[in-house]
Structure formats: structure tokens, C-alpha cells
């Protein structure tokens, strides 16, 4: 059960990290 909590925290941290980068640096290449 502990592993699930760790994975959740890790995913949240990664998500916040990418979110901060996206807001700090707008994507130069606007291609999907």
C-alpha cells in the first residue's frame, strides 16, 4: 500500500514540474 502513495506523490510532483515549466516558458513550436 505504501508504494501506491509514493507513486501518487511522484506523479503529482512530475505534473507540477511540467506545469511550472509550461507556464514559465511558453512553447515556441505550436505544432500538435
Curated annotation (Swiss-Prot):
Q: What is this protein called?
A: Photosystem II reaction center protein T
Return the similarity comment: Belongs to the PsbT family.
What is the organism of origin for this protein? Answer: Cyanothece sp. (strain PCC 7425 / ATCC 29141)
Has UniProt tagged this entry with the keyword Thylakoid?
yes
According to its UniProt entry, the protein's GO biological process terms are: photosynthesis
Keyword list (alphabetical) reads: Membrane, Photosynthesis, Photosystem II, Thylakoid, Transmembrane, Transmembrane helix
- Name the InterPro entries on file: PSII_PsbT, PSII_PsbT_sf
Stretches that traverse the bilayer? 3-23
Report the subcellular localization: Cellular thylakoid membrane
Question: Source gene?
Answer: psbT
A Gene Ontology CC term for this entry?
plasma membrane-derived thylakoid membrane
Described by its record, this protein's role is as follows: Found at the monomer-monomer interface of the photosystem II (PS II) dimer, plays a role in assembly and dimerization of PSII. PSII is a light-driven water plastoquinone oxidoreductase, using light energy to abstract electrons from H(2)O, generating a proton gradient subsequently used for ATP formation.
Pfam families, sorted: PsbT
Quaternary assembly: PSII is composed of 1 copy each of membrane proteins PsbA, PsbB, PsbC, PsbD, PsbE, PsbF, PsbH, PsbI, PsbJ, PsbK, PsbL, PsbM, PsbT, PsbX, PsbY, PsbZ, Psb30/Ycf12, peripheral proteins PsbO, CyanoQ (PsbQ), PsbU, PsbV and a large number of cofactors. It forms dimeric complexes.
Give the bilayer topology.
Single-pass membrane protein
Amino acid at each position: 500500500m505504501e508504494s501506491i502513495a509514493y507513486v501518487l506523490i511522484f506523479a503529482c510532483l512530475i505534473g507540477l514540474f511540467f506545469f511550472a515549466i509550461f507556464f514559465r516558458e511558453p512553447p515556441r513550436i505550436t505544432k500538435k
